[in-house]
């Protein structure tokens, strides 16, 4: 239906005709002149890739921290973080919009990316994956003098490429399918 609709005029599409028409070039020219689809696509891709990279970095480090570090109240904080998944995004939109407005972030990429970066599901996902990683290797690296960033980026991330790939696919799809929040915080066509 989409392919035949792209080749027909709008009158033919609304009549329910399912045959290929001769208006593909004209329809594409009208689409490009009215919406600049290529620029919109590049802008969406840029925001989605930045979001994916930063959210994977933040959520993987949080999951690693929740699993491998010992501190008082860690489980309570983790539980509260997981409970935040029960709050629907529609209930969070107004407070997030007010915060973005007070921070003068409206009509910017930051307003689209920042409020939803820390995804509880990805933190849970990475924590579960890091449970299978041997703590003895981390302790051996600390004894050898490696700092925490070296341990995380060179020792821990290397064997968990499939976990990071799955998390990146999830984050990419979540942001790519996010239509409502950008519609709210970006109020201009520029």
Give a label for each model feature.
Residues 1-190:
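A structural signal for multi-pass alpha-helical bundles of membrane permease subunits
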């Amino acid at each position: 239906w989409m392919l035949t609709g792209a080749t027909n005029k709008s009158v033919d599409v609304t009549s329910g005709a399912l045959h290929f028409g001769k208006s593909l070039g004209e329809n594409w020219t009208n689409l490009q002149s009215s919406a600049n689809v290529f620029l919109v696509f590049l802008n969406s891709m840029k925001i989605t890739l930045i979001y994916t990279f930063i959210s994977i970095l933040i959520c993987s480090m949080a999951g690693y921290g929740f699993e491998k570090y010992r501190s008082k109240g860690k489980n309570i904080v983790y539980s509260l973080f997981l409970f935040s998944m029960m709050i629907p995004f529609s209930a969070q939109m107004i407070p997030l919009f007010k915060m973005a407005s007070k921070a003068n972030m409206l009509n910017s990429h930051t307003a689209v990316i920042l409020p939803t970066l820390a995804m509880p599901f990805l933190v849970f996902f990475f924590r579960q994956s890091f449970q299978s990683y041997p703590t003895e290797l981390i302790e051996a690296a600390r004894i050898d003098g490696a700092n925490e960033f070296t341990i995380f980026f060179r020792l821990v991330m290397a064997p968990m490429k499939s976990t990071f790939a799955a998390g990146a696919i999830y984050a990419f799809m979540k942001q790519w399918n996010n239509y409502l929040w950008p519609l709210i915080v970006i109020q201009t066509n520029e």
